[in-house]
Amino acid sequence: MGLCVRSSINIPYFHYAMIYLDNMGRLKVMESPSIQEQNETVFTTEVRERFLEILGAKVGYQPPMVRSIYDPQQPLGCLSYRQTKRDRNSPAHSMYGVPPSVQFSAPVEESPSCGSVDMVGLEIGDTPNVLDYYERSLKHFRQVNCRQILKTFIKFIEPRKQAKHPYNGGKPPAGAPPGKKGDPEKTKPEWWPANVVHKEPDHLRKDRTCNPSENLQCQVTLLTDLERLSLLIHIIRRLGRFGITTDQLQEIAHDCKRRLSDPHKLQILDEVFRVRRIEERYERGEVDANKIVYVVNRESNQKEKDGDSNVDPDQKHEQEDDNAREALPILHSEKNSTSPMSNSAEHTGMAAPSRPMNMGGDRNQLFPLPEWPSFGETPQDDRIFFPTTSKYTEDYASQQMPRTPATTALVSTNETHAAFDYMTQESITSSSPEQTSHHRQAPLPMQHSASLDPWTPTFRHNFFNPMVYSTAPRHAMSQATMLSQFPRSTTSHGQEMPHMAHGLPNLPQDRPSSMDGMSMRGPSFRTGFLSHPCDPSQQAPHSSGCGHPDSWTQNRPHV
């Protein structure tokens, strides 16, 4: 409840309530804070109307012509709207199924308004101002409520409208070409206004086009909403000759109160119907054109004004859906133009890393070498994934991100060696301290069995990432040179291992002689055939080795 309007009158009491008319003829109320704390008001709508009725001719107020069920002057033969619904097909009814003598017989339930109401006078003979009042009041009633009320009114006025007056224009005329639809304007009922297109109230805002060069979308939306308001005002004011009375429309509006977004706004329609009754008296010549009707000045309270009266929430969702449909081709083209790496990242459900590698002067190298992992840091904390961008597409275009078989998560380039080549040790090609200190050696993360040779060359072929040697001749030759510098004998290898600076433990020297050949075979793995391991000694000198640590069993005689 809003705060009361204070006046210059100083009331020396703690509890009070006052109703008055100011110098402008506006109805005002004032209540003490003790009453306002209860979120209620003493001056309900009935009290305010009674106050104006008592003043009567002094303020030019006429009581509303609403008959209630407890009115002793109501005729006994009067029937309500609910009683006449079952008798619509009776011959006594008019052509639109409503008898003109039906009276409004149910009491209108009105919620109490706030403690302070600003009311203004409306001259009933000033038709443009009266029409403007109808339009402004229905805007505060909200468009979503207007659609609901309109559908209920149309169903009451024309119960079989889809059969008699379809919105789609009905069947096309005889001899029409295939695909031609009927004209909705030709099936428009007689009571429908001529300046409103024959559309269902939910679709009056559609089927409007404008010049794309002119930004008139908001104006087009406003015009369609005005058409809906024009249809509602026409039904309220111009259907008396078809047997539709204001009392019937008011009762129908209260019947669909629960379907409104804000049932309390129904009091706006009650005031509209009250003004319409006085306007009917003016049309019949019962009152003069100077008759003043006091209505609520809703424009003075901007908080009550519906900011979405012109564009309701349903219309906003439909506009967003239309914009989304227009954006689909753009998104589809952008998706097709992305790099292969971004597509692979989207396929695995993870974002590709967009952080550049620090490659120094070798930025043009086709196969950039990642930095060696430092176990003094926590690599997991540095795993930051960002959405893929095309900024570094040139650096990552020829590099495939490795993926473990057990998970679909991508491994960053800084963790490639730590994730797959954890047993790989850097070869020492020179004894100069500048070259040896350039590479950081990583200790063996776990103790392996003595039956396996823990030493593997640096350039071990990664079967997860096939490499085309023709694209990087300089890199391939440098790795082959490094391989040729290692001795192939088991004696030299066993003697040099304790003196290497790679941090490997001193393995037992008393291993079986049948396993000495393992040091000459390099990296080994199965080719997929369990009974036929591949011997790397039968391959080319610089090709990647294949086989299995148990491949020494092939020297045994077959049974």
Swiss-Prot record:
Keyword Transcription recorded: no
Composition-biased stretches (Basic and acidic residues): 180-189, 300-325
Transmembrane segments: none
Biased composition (Low complexity): 169-179
Induction text: Expression is regulated by the hypoxia responsive morphology factor A (hrmA).
Keywords: Cell adhesion, Virulence
Positions of the UniProt region annotated as Disordered: 163-190, 298-351, 427-451, 525-559
Keyword hit for Nucleotide-binding: no
UniProt superkingdom: Eukaryota
Positions with biased composition (Polar residues): 336-346
One GO-annotated biological process of the protein: cell adhesion
InterPro entries: AFUB_07903/YDR124W-like_hel, AFUB_079030/YDR124W-like
Record's function text: Part of the subtelomeric hrmA-associated cluster (HAC) containing genes that alter the hyphal surface (such as reduced total chitin or increased beta-glucan exposure) and perturb inter-hyphal interactions within the developing biofilms, resulting in a loss of vertically aligned polarized growing filaments. Consequently, this hypoxia-typic morphotype (called H-MORPH) with altered biofilm architecture leads to increased hypoxia fitness, increased host inflammation, rapid disease progression, and mortality in a murine model of invasive aspergillosis.
Descriptive protein name: Subtelomeric hrmA-associated cluster protein AFUA_5G14920
Organism expressing this protein natively: Aspergillus fumigatus (strain ATCC MYA-4609 / CBS 101355 / FGSC A1100 / Af293)
